[in-house]
Amino acid sequence: MENRSLVTIAEHSKEKILYMLEMAKQFEMNPNRRLLQGKVVATLFFEPSTRTRLSFETAANRLGARVIGFTDPKATSSSKGETLKDTIMMVSSYADIIVMRHYLEGAARYASEVAPVPIVNAGDGANQHPSQTMLDLYSIYKTQGTLENLNIFLVGDLKYGRTVHSLLMAMRHFNPTFHFIAPDELKMPEEYKLYCKEHQIKYIEHTEFTEEIIADADILYMTRVQRERFTDLMEYERVKNVYILRNKMLENTRPNLRILHPLPRVNEIAYDVDNNPKAYYFQQAQNGLYAREAILCDVLGITLEDVKNDILL
């Protein structure tokens, strides 16, 4: 049987991305369905999560599925030395699909190769976060009316930020111009800049974060500096507040600008920005429900036509 796992957004074609966005739109019209009645969704979170875990579990519940899983690996047999493979094999015997977050880069790929059920990557270390990318794409499409020819500014932790890595790969189909704004310690890794060159993705690098630089942005994608990725806490303290978006910086930006953030926020967006109509990060998080309903259905073989023909409850 075809493995329908979602490990990286790089495996999605342009047509597939647009198909998934249309499916998310259907779920926004009515999120309450019974398309996954009788299915069991396992959520295995080896790292902390609020939005990703809760939105996947809410998506499963709204689709009629049951949810099992854990949020604290210390309370599981992995703390006794059980291997990831054994954990995956055991959970596969209980569930129809596994949503997994893990601290090791490549863990989702490995799980997809050993599991008899589909794996959805809910974040693997500093590597990829494809479900976040799907809701980011949906948010961009909703606010801009297109994914084509946009100026997208990625700000903050571009080294460890798996959300920006996935978004960059997904946007290769839509002729974006990226602006990478990061201190030298957190700049976009060379492998992703090489990816841009291989796919003719335009990008410009900055170390300064000013209102002049962001004046032409369509999307301003803020990220937090991730303390948990640093082995040297002195280095973290040095860079954690390097860029802070303040309301005054938005006065001369484009009318269509929207500010996105994968959340949680720490200090990188001042609270007075929340009331600015260009702030979209809380709506973005809400879009996660619809995008993840689409992901669960697609991975389990339910088509867009099935969703459109489903009786709304």
From Swiss-Prot:
Where, in this chain's numbering, is carbamoyl phosphate bound? R51, T52, R101, H129, Q132, L263, P264
Task: Tell me the HAMAP family matching this sequence.
Answer: Asp_carb_tr
Species classification: Bacteria, Pseudomonadati, Bacteroidota, Bacteroidia, Bacteroidales
Please provide the record's keywords in A-Z order.
Pyrimidine biosynthesis, Transferase
| Reactions performed catalytically | carbamoyl phosphate + L-aspartate = N-carbamoyl-L-aspartate + phosphate + H(+)
InterPro entries, A to Z: Asp/Orn_carbamoyltranf_P-bd (IPR006132), Asp/Orn_carbamoylTrfase (IPR006130), Asp/Orn_carbamoylTrfase_sf (IPR036901), Asp_carbamoyltransf (IPR002082), Asp_carbamoyltransf_Asp/Orn-bd (IPR006131)
Which pathway? Pyrimidine metabolism; UMP biosynthesis via de novo pathway; (S)-dihydroorotate from bicarbonate: step 2/3
Against Pfam families, the record matches this protein to: OTCace (PF00185), OTCace_N (PF02729)
Q: Which organism is it from?
A: Bacteroides thetaiotaomicron (strain ATCC 29148 / DSM 2079 / JCM 5827 / CCUG 10774 / NCTC 10582 / VPI-5482 / E50)
Query: What protein is this chain from?
Result: Aspartate carbamoyltransferase catalytic subunit
- What does this protein do, in the record's words? Catalyzes the condensation of carbamoyl phosphate and aspartate to form carbamoyl aspartate and inorganic phosphate, the committed step in the de novo pyrimidine nucleotide biosynthesis pathway.
Q: Which residues form the signal peptide?
A: none
